[in-house]
A protein has these predicted regions:
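Periplasmic polypeptide-binding modules associated with outer-membrane biogenesis and secretion
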Residues: 1-106, 126-154
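Hydrophobic, lipid-facing positions within transmembrane beta-strands of outer-membrane proteins
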Residues: 84-86, 110-114, 155-159
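A short, contiguous, amphipathic alpha-helix enriched in charged residues
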Residues: 112-117, 124
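Residue-level signature of outer-membrane beta-barrel architecture
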Residues: 118-120, 149
Length: 160
């Protein structure tokens, strides 16, 4: 068979490297924007870099406030002015903990522990009741309260 091949010539013209223009954050109902923005390696004015996008995705995942599978950076290029806008799509996950334990010892009787830990607490929002869910949240601070006691001699109170 003669003439069974096709020659294709492709020409790619590379433009200038895009600069990051705007950063948008969606899906953060509890966590404040400034907590997320301090983890971003993709900053407006810098050149777009895919490895920094991946690094930011990993660091947002390590905060523990978001579902790692749902952290999705969406770059939107604008070829006219050689910029790119990035939208960070996030989905928050529960990160608070409740600890309850109890037991019975022969001499001491009942032994018990009650604890609460909030990993996205906000001291700044204590006076702003609209930010309470059920406590003030959003600034990435940790609050932990724990009480241990037995029926006779031993009690421990912890607040950090």
């Amino acid at each position: 068979m003669i003439g069974d091949s096709v020659d294709i010539e492709m020409r790619v013209y590379e433009g200038a490297q895009a600069t990051i223009n705007k950063i948008f954050i969606t899906g953060n109902d509890r966590t404040s924007d400034h907590v997320i923005r301090r983890e971003l390696r993709t900053i407006p004015g810098q050149k777009y870099n895919r490895s920094e996008l991946i690094r930011t995705q990993r660091e947002l995942s390590q905060l523990g406030y978001f579902d790692p599978e749902s952290i999705n950076p969406v770059p939107v290029p604008n070829p006219q002015n050689e910029t790119v806008d990035i939208t960070w799509e996030l989905a928050e996950k529960p990160s608070d903990q409740v600890e309850l334990s109890g037991g019975w010892g022969g001499y001491f009787g009942f032994v018990g522990t009650v604890g609460l830990s909030f990993s996205n607490f906000s001291v700044k929002n204590i006076k702003d009741f609209s930010k309470w869910r059920p406590l003030p949240v959003g600034d990435g601070q940790k609050l932990s309260v724990r009480v241990q006691a037995n029926g006779r001699q031993f009690q421990t109170y912890s607040f950090t």
